[in-house]
Amino acid sequence: MTKPIIGISTCFEKHSLFHYHQSGEKYISAVINAMGGFPILIPDLADKLDYDKLFSTVDGILLTGSYSNVEPHHYNGHSSKSSTKHDLQRDATILPLIPKAVNVGIPLFAICRGFQEMNVAYQGSLHQEVHTVEGKQDHREDSTKDIDGQYDFAHSVTLTKNGVLSQLTNENELRVNSVHWQGVDELGEGLQIEAVAPDGLIEAISIKNAKNFALGVQWHPEWKVMEIPFYKAIFDAFGRACTSHADLKK
């Protein structure tokens, strides 16, 4: 069986005197263990990135979560609080990458910040602080808990009937983790809701009329993916799409 090459988004971070293009180990492990893929990192080169070369190389793209948030001018939002972390290099690399990848049929799976990037890339907007929005619950993790506690199931999501996610399980409602404080406000153009939280917050989206797998989720299915059947089913579906895309390139 073909081992698909999966491009993983990175964050542009400065440590000491130098900048690094880096990605979380849990995403790399999920690509290897949950879908049998070969991970490579996509550097945040903005307009210097050769998208055509990237798309001819990879069989799928995984957009990761991050400690940074999309800079709000990309969705006509108000200025962020001074304590908010942004990553302008990632914004400039990934926001244009998403529609380009979808248009050429590259399978795309977006998680957390990646999910929010997907919405913004299609002219959607974000809540900068979900917990301050009337009627919305607090979706942030409990930082007093250990890592297992922070990533434990936090709330349910209701799946859209006949949607991408609903086809992966017999359940209409499942429990997911929640470690975010930004979230989708206005849904982007050409996007479809795949799951919502009890407070109505959009938790998963897909791209209508995409040529291939194009899904984004707010939660973190890469966390303990081999232990949670629903999370594994999502990576399995992404993996099948990537393997099929790789086979077509032979």
Say what each PLM segment does.
Residues 1-109, 120, 127, 131-168, ...:
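N-terminal beta1-alpha1 cap of cysteine-dependent amidohydrolase-like domains
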Residues 112:
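Conserved G/P- and acidic residue-centered "switch" motifs that form tight phosphate/ATP-binding loops
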Residues 115:
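The feature captures the ABC ATPase H-loop/switch
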Residues 170-175:
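Catalytic cores of DNA base-excision repair glycosylases
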Residues 178:
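Short basic/aromatic active-site micro-motif
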Residues 215-218:
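Active-site-proximal beta-strand elements of phosphoester/diester hydrolases
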